[in-house]
A protein has these predicted regions:
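Intrinsically disordered, low-complexity terminal tails and inter-domain linkers enriched
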Residues: 4-5, 240-286
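C-terminal and late-domain segments of enzyme folds
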Residues: 119, 284-287, 299-318, 329, ...
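Acyltransferase
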Residues: 206-244, 281-286, 295-299, 464-496
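Internal gly/pro-rich beta-alpha loop/helix module
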Residues: 137-246
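A short helix->loop->beta-strand "cap" motif at the edges of active sites that frequently abuts
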Residues: 124, 181, 363-367
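ATP-dependent carboxylate-amine ligase catalytic core
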Residues: 8-28, 34-122, 130-157, 166-169
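Cysteine-nucleophile active-site neighborhood
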Residues: 317, 341-422
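Phosphate-binding active sites in nucleotide-utilizing proteins
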Residues: 282-284, 289-352, 356-361
Length: 496
């Protein structure tokens, strides 16, 4: 499944919200902007730069629609641009939220997968969010340095965070020294403006008391202190892009698999596409295959692009709650995504009927993908934060426990080992993803080799058992759609 760009260009109004560093208020301000800009009947689409799961959940809560991830490490330049064009088509405005500091990419050393890289690939005007509390004229060399670091920075505007109206007047005078970059407004200190964190990121939006009220108050404040007309004009100034061709799942070739990580330059080099045989019938004409996908407070980390690709290959997602549903829904396949099962171990462990059904289904050969939290769920037991163990599915022999520090964090490329008979990833084939987890287990598997894109560090991982492929890595299916095509086809083969 490879999206291609056609030559005819089309307008996609868009902006990217970035910052010099993490903690500047990108997510908070992005959510307020989404609420504010969605007024007057505008149809908005949100995107997150990079692999993060939490920020798109905030975007989704504000807009009531899915938020996509765009990542140049996962999919390379052409495919990233095509994914944006496909998902943004039909919307009045796209708002992308950046990641970390503006130029922070792979390994903290490369530009690949940085906010700048996404702006460059998609030719998107960038608005910097600068936490200017306790700062005035220093913003000038700060912004000038970011502008001069590359030949074309794409930075066009600035919003100052945590400043008063009087401080903003001084800052706007300072900004007169920076031609081509406009001060678009400010956000003063607001009560309840700080959202807590867990593990690596923000807590989830449904856990914040009166979240919608907070966003409404934020949007009302921004309406008073932002130059909305100038911001919308900036979005309209984004150059036209070629829209994706209408290559659907009806026999489209899968996109290239990533190259060997050690050869990675600032832009990923991709192998030639897999010249697979096309199906006898296009996927959209074939019978839809029901695939059960865990989705609740324990399992909420699943890329919208992954879900869309499943559907394009003929899957009919059937969502269920491992916390509340006593039985597995009728389905021919199973996906257990990541999330925070460690926070809900008592509820998960008490649901013994579902635990048994999942174990029996996998033992009987049901095609199953499990990653991170879903991988923990399949273990014999998992300890909570206090060290108490809870029995879970008990399909895998491991016992999982929390570490005081991160076990692994960051991007990886997964390669199926030679001689391994993996159900969906042939020997030597690759797929890209990332890990971030404090939990570890004594049964991590050794069917694949994971390698970091910078530095070349590698380790064994992934469990392959019958039709199960499971491990800690979160996989981004668009980096090798052939894997998910094989998964759906195996589910279809078992669909009675």
């Amino acid at each position: 499944m490879s999206l291609r760009l056609t030559m005819q260009k089309k307008s996609f109004p868009r902006i990217l919200i970035a910052a010099p560093q993490s903690g500047s208020g990108k997510t908070y301000l992005t959510c307020g902007l989404l609420r504010l800009l969605s007024g007057n009947g505008r149809r908005l689409h949100a995107f997150k730069c990079g692999p993060d799961f939490i920020d798109p959940l905030f975007h989704k809560q504000v807009l009531g629609i899915p938020s996509g991830n765009l990542d140049s490490f996962f999919t390379g330049e052409e495919q990233t641009l095509a994914l944006f064009a496909k998902e943004a088509e039909g919307y009045d405005l796209s708002v992308m939220e950046g990641v970390m500091g503006y130029y922070d990419g792979l390994g903290g050393r490369l530009l690949t997968a940085s906010s700048y890289d996404l702006a460059r690939i998609t030719k998107t005007p960038v608005i910097l969010v600068i936490n200017a509390r306790g700062m005035s004229r220093t913003v000038v060399p700060l912004i000038k340095g970011l502008l001069s670091y590359t030949e074309e920075s794409w930075i066009r505007g600035v919003i100052f965070n945590r400043v008063s109206s009087s401080a903003y007047r001084i800052l706007t005078k300072c900004m007169e020294e920076i031609p081509g970059v406009k001060a678009l407004g400010y956000l003063p200190e607001l009560k309840d403006a700080s959202w807590g964190s867990r593990h690596l990121g923000l807590i989830q939006p449904e856990e914040i008391p009166l979240f919608q009220n907070q966003i409404d108050a934020l949007a009302n404040q921004l309406e008073e202190t932002l130059d909305l007309e100038a911001l919308l004009s900036l979005a309209q100034s984004a150059p036209p892009l070629p829209p994706p061709s209408r290559s659907s799942s009806s026999g489209a070739k899968p996109s290239p698999s990533p190259s060997k990580v050690t050869a990675l330059r600032e832009e990923p080099t991709l192998l030639s596409p897999d010249q697979r045989e096309e199906p006898a019938l296009p996927f959209f004409l074939q019978k839809k295959v029901p695939i059960a996908i865990a989705r609740d407070a324990s399992f909420s980390f699943f890329y919208e692009e992954n879900l869309r690709l499943l559907k394009e290959f003929g899957a009919n997602p059937v969502f269920f709650s491992p916390m509340k549903d006593a039985h597995l829904p009728k389905a021919s396949g199973l996906i257990l995504p990541g999330g925070y099962p460690e926070l809900h171990l008592q509820e998960l462990s008490r649901n013994t009927s579902l635990l048994q059904e999942i174990r029996d289904a996998i033992e009987s050969g049901m095609p199953t993908l499990a990653e991170c939290g879903g991988f923990l769920y399949l273990q014999k037991s998992v300890q909570d934060m206090g060290g108490q163990s809870f029995p879970l599915v008990n399909l895998l022999p491991g016992s999982a426990h929390k570490n005081s520090r991160l076990v692994r964090f960051g991007y990886l490329e997964l390669t199926a080992k030679a001689g391994q008979d993996l159900p969906y990833l042939p020997s030597g084939e690759k797929i890209r993803g990332h890990e971030f987890h404090y939990y570890d287990t004594d049964a991590n598997g050794e069917s694949c080799t994971a390698e970091k894109p910078v530095g070349g560090r590698s380790w064994d991982c992934m469990v392959s058992y019958k039709n199960l492929l499971a491990g800690f890595p979160h996989l981004y299916y668009e980096s090798n759609p052939a894997l998910i095509r094989r998964f759906v086809e195996r589910c279809r083969g078992l669909d009675g």
